[in-house]
Amino acid sequence: GSGLVGSEMCIRDRSDTVGFIRKLPTELVESFKSTLDEVREADLLVHVVDISHPTFEEQIEVVNRTLSEIDKTEKPMIMVFNKIDAFTFVPKDEDDLTPRTRENIDLDELKRTWMNKMQDNCIFISAKERTNIDALKALLYERVKQIHITRFPYNDFLFQQYDEE
């Protein structure tokens, strides 16, 4: 498969945020703080969301609120909606006048909403089915490249310019 040039240097590691969706036991708080330190040091945050989870939007809010509490700087973020293969919705009958709920929103409508909200800094994938994995790699590559070029404008070691012709 194709890899990211220089990805070993740029994407140091990922932090698992599932632990703070619900209240943390006291003994985990200290180890969790070190995970949060990694967030403070990161140049780019990649938030992976399980889109098949019934309360995924609530989980996104908890993560975003926690991120803003621990780090006041605005960091670039890519939202990765995973498990599109397991996403389900309940279509409503045309004559059904009850208000729509989250269960009535299809994947295309969800994509449009989140692409708008995230200014296209999100992607919908299925890691299991390998759907959009190459697009995810390309998106990560572009974002890391933008950060690198901003930080090191005269150093194209990681991202050398090639003619596309």
Enumerate the language-model features and the residues they cover.
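Loop/turn-to-beta-strand initiation segments
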Residues: R12, D43-L44, K75-I78
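Inter-motif core of Ras-like GTPase G domains
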Residues: V29-H53, T66-E69
